[in-house]
Amino acid sequence: MLSGDQLTQTLTTAIKNGDAPDLFCLPGGVKLSTAVSEGWYQPMTDYLSQEFIDSFSPGSLNEGVTTLDGEIYVLPEAANIVNSLVFYNRDIFEECGLDPDAPPETWSEFVAACKTITEHGNGKYYGIIESGSAAQRLEIELRSFANIAGAKCNYYGVMSVVDGQNPFASDAMKSALDIYAQLAADGSIHPDSINLDAPSARAMFAQGQAGFLIQGSWCIPTWRAENPDFNFDVMALPVPDDGAKGGNPYTGAQPWMGISATCEHPEAAALYLTELYGTDYQSKIVSDGGFVSCIEGVNEEAMSDPMMLKYYNLAMSSGKLSPDPLALNPETAEVYSQVKEVTPNLGQIVQGVMAGSITDTAGALDTFSADTQAAWQAACDAAGVDISAFEFDDWDPMADYDYSK
């Protein structure tokens, strides 16, 4: 199984070599506007029935996200929910004298639990195992912790500013990164983490090598199939000791599958998509667990796994819909196409903290924030878009953002 980063690299190489499949997903980190401008996809609206288009839940097909100038280019894979909840091993909890029915709720309780598990494990297991080679996963986690502390840093890959500035040097972001610094200092992070992709970390967690794992609902069906006796549970991401000042951020359904511009039989490709998103197939994959459909009415009827239902309910209660500039201000698409990535990025900074190569966490974030601000401003200038298009004064991070305003 390919990790997200590996899939992105494989797809991008195939597309640039002219070997793209007839149907392919939008590579991670690539905006739809960029893909369309480079001739990767062809519009599919003419090949889809209105009944099919209307079957998607509200917010699934948005201008600037799945659609450009009224033409649908890609479809979302699933409804987007929080994918950074915390799984924990109930058996390890009991072995370490922790109550599996009362998991940690605050940052200090979480760090303390990780330390207790690590000390009790004595090399057999550790407090937490991370997908350390997947910078994207680490950035998603860090943004989640920071947003809960009030950073208003939005979801992975989304540009947001507060008073015209990015939030990456905020006190909330710095305190979130300090969690990883403390876990590393305590020796609570599994030592193999820095080299692990998400599937490997997931597998080792199920083998009893750590007390905690931060990932998404996709873990559940894998463990049901491969580790049927694994005694796991799920909890919300812990909040700061003085209480949450935001929710775990997520945006609306994201772009996924489109028809290649080189596809010679787009009608057949569209027919495949019609079946893929049909109620029968969507109901089956929802009932299998680990999947939340973007087709209206399917989730309520088909979700049957109790752990998946618990994950879904926690995601809905702790997660808060954040503003997506692409959906709210479509002109921002040109900014995204112009912006240059700053390295090390947030995920790579977390990697450095885990590995011990970054000890000045505040300084690392200050530098990243300054470099990012310059890159964002340059992209805005090149696109002729004011940076205020990425600022949402009406955004209360403790509530779902109201897209109807």
Model segments located where?
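Extracytoplasmic/periplasmic solute-binding protein
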Residues: T66-A79, S84, E94, S108-Q165, ...
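A structural signal for short loop-to-beta-strand junctions that line the ligand-binding cleft
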Residues: A14, P21-D22, I53-I92, A244-Y250, ...
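Hinge/lid segment of periplasmic solute-binding proteins
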Residues: G29-L85, I140-R143, I148, D233-M235, ...
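Long, aromatic- and glycine/proline-rich binding clefts that accommodate carbohydrate-like moieties
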Residues: P228, M235, S287-A355, V385-K405
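Glycine-centered hinge/linker elements that transmit conformational signals in sensory
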Residues: V111-K115, M159-S193, L237
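Extracytoplasmic "Venus flytrap"/periplasmic binding protein-like
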Residues: M1-G59, E63, E94-E105, M204, ...
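Short, solvent-exposed loop/beta-turn-alpha elements that line the ligand-binding surface or hinge
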Residues: T45-G59, P103-E105, A149-S175, A225-N227, ...
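Extracytoplasmic/periplasmic substrate-recognition and gating elements
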Residues: N17, C96, D186, A225-S293, ...
